[in-house]
UniProtKB/Swiss-Prot annotation:
ANK repeats lie at residues 301-330, 340-370. InterPro entries: Ankyrin_rpt (IPR002110), Ankyrin_rpt-contain_sf (IPR036770). Residues 468-477 have a biased composition (Basic residues). Pfam families: Ank_2. This is Ankyrin repeat domain-containing protein SOWAHC. The modification Phosphoserine is found at residues 88, 126, 213, 226.
Length: 525
């Protein structure tokens, strides 16, 4: 008959032949190797070859599945697990098919292929029907399929919809043969753990110094500055005297440059916390260990220990720091500036610490005329509730109180508001010659100093205290006003009145005057 002759080459093709071929290779073989092995049964005429190939594909799909290894893109034919479990396979090594994963590890050349069959037998909970009828071009289900590796046999069960739960549970023989991506994730995880372990210390310090004020975050290290400083100081000195020398030598450079290095050693870190806390108990141990910390500036705010003491209003601490500097012969600048240009007197005036202001000006002769980078003196930060003696002490008499004195003098205008830019003022260095005729004018001119009225009673009270620094040179000078056109006088005023005053040579301004008219006063004559 024509049928047996036509199907003669396909007679050798059967489930047993394919099953035997895969079982001999551990349940897994290259697709090209399988096709090459049965190529003799797939030849013949084109029509016969097409039927033989279709028949061969059906046989392979009946007993195995085709998968692509993502590592190299090679196609592998895997034996289905029901054929791996059954003991009725015609040939091959039965123990090799039925044993578990542990005894299969030391097998010979067929060991890697046999291990690839075991996930199907060891994972019965996975769906057996998935990927069963795969063709040659069917996409792979698992994420990783390294060839001939022990990790691949566990990955075969990743035909399930949820591949991730099986990844973190490797078997005892998978510790040295993890897939490449798994290794990268593990390394990345370990590096992240290592980075987070090193980060808190530096970030803690940065949070302490980068806030609005370091004392707001003292809760990170409350009361523990002294123990930390002793241990940190011991560690810094253990490395040599270079650390201590660098702290002292960098103070002068930081004073001029305005900041130091962001990285602090433990001793400097403890100093920052103790200085911002403003307690002598914690500062004493650090200053004894390293006296140069007394004049060291914070690299963010530019504060020294003196600035912190003035800010907190602790005059006892301020006196102790100055005495400590004198005892150790340290040059201390009581007028040292912060990063914003503030002196200790500025900070004490800002926060209303009157006793600190008295100590700085009276005992340590702080300069009351220094202005910060905003152009303000310390007296301009005093609140209105501060006593008048304290304002006179810091030089507020000539700055802000002239307005109130002028306001009590019958509604006079301040010269700075009256005089326009084209009126020139001259300072006379000689005394007034005709004191009799111009006595009244002389007296009124002395009452104005730099455009502000002086209070005679305030002068007497200030001189009794001995703390005022009056500007005597301004008192000696007189102010001469040169009238130029246009004039301040009302253009509608009759000429007779102006003639009586002796200033008839001035001509009225025609039209509307661009300057504000002022009331008459004895200052201008």
């Amino acid at each position: 008959m024509e049928g047996p002759a036509e199907w003669g080459p396909e007679a050798a093709l059967g489930p047993e032949a394919v099953l035997r071929f895969l079982a001999e290779r551990g349940g897994r073989a290259l697709h090209a190797e399988l096709v090459q092995h049965f190529r003799g049964a797939l030849g013949g005429e084109p029509e016969q070859r097409a039927r033989a190939r279709a028949h061969f594909k059906e046989l392979v799909n009946a007993v195995a599945t085709v998968r692509v290894d993502p590592a190299d893109g090679a196609k592998y034919v895997h034996l289905k697990k029901r054929f791996c479990e059954g003991p009725s396979e015609p040939s091959g090594d039965p123990p090799r098919i039925q044993v578990t994963a542990e005894p299969e590890a030391p097998d010979g050349p067929a060991g890697p292929e046999a291990r690839d069959r075991l996930p199907d037998a060891a994972a019965p909970e996975s769906l057996p029907g998935q990927g069963r009828e795969l063709g040659e071009g069917e996409p792979p289900a698992p994420a990783h399929w390294p060839p001939l590796s022990a990790g691949a046999r566990r990955k075969n069960s990743r035909r399930d919809v949820q591949p991730l739960p099986r990844t973190p549970a490797p078997g005892p023989s998978e510790d040295l043969e993890l897939p490449p991506h798994g290794c990268e994730e593990a390394d990345r995880g370990s590096s992240l753990v290592g980075a987070t372990a090193q980060r808190p210390a530096r970030q803690n310090l940065r949070d302490l110094v980068m806030g609005s004020s370091p004392q707001l975050k003292r809760s990170v290290c409350p009361g523990g500055s002294s123990p930390g400083s002793s241990s940190g100081g011991g560690r810094g000195r253990g490395g040599g005297d270079s650390d201590s020398a660098s702290v002292a030598s960098s103070s002068a450079e930081e004073e001029s440059s305005g900041g130091g290095s962001v990285t602090l050693d433990p001793l400097e870190h403890a100093w920052m916390l103790s200085a911002s806390d403003g307690k002598w108990d914690s500062l004493e141990g650090l200053l004894t260990c390293e006296p140069g910390l007394l004049v060291k500036r914070d690299f963010i705010t530019g504060f020294t220990c003196l600035h912190w003491a003035a800010k907190h209003g602790r005059q006892e601490l301020l006196a102790m720091l100055v005495n400590f500097a004198n005892k150790h012969q340290l040059p201390v600048n009581i007028d040292a500036r912060t990063s914003g240009g503030y002196t200790a007197l500025h900070l004490a005036a800002m926060h209303g610490h009157v006793e600190v202001v008295k100590l700085l000006v009276g005992a340590y002769d702080a300069d009351v005329d220094i202005r910060d980078y905003s152009g303000k003196k310390a007296s301009q930060y005093l609140s209105r509730s501060i006593a008048e003696e304290i304002k006179n002490l810091v030089g507020a008499l000539d700055e802000g109180d002239g307005e109130s004195a002028a306001g009590s003098g019958g509604g006079r205008w301040r010269l700075s508001k009256v005089l326009p830019s084209h009126l020139i003022t001259y300072k006379l260095s000689h005394a007034l010659e005709d004191g009799g005729d111009h006595h009244h004018h002389h007296h009124s001119a002395e009452g104005w100093v730099g455009g502000k009225a002086k209070d005679p009673g305030r002068k007497a009270s200030g001189s009794s205290s001995g703390r005022i620094k009056p500007r005597l040179n301004k008192i000696r000078f007189r102010t001469q006003i040169v009238h130029t056109t246009p004039s301040f006088r009302d253009p509608e005023q009759p000429l007779e009145g102006r003639g009586e005053e002796g200033v008839g040579e001035e001509r009225p301004v025609k039209g509307h005057s661009p300057f504000t008219l002022r009331p008459k006063s004895n200052v201008f004559g």
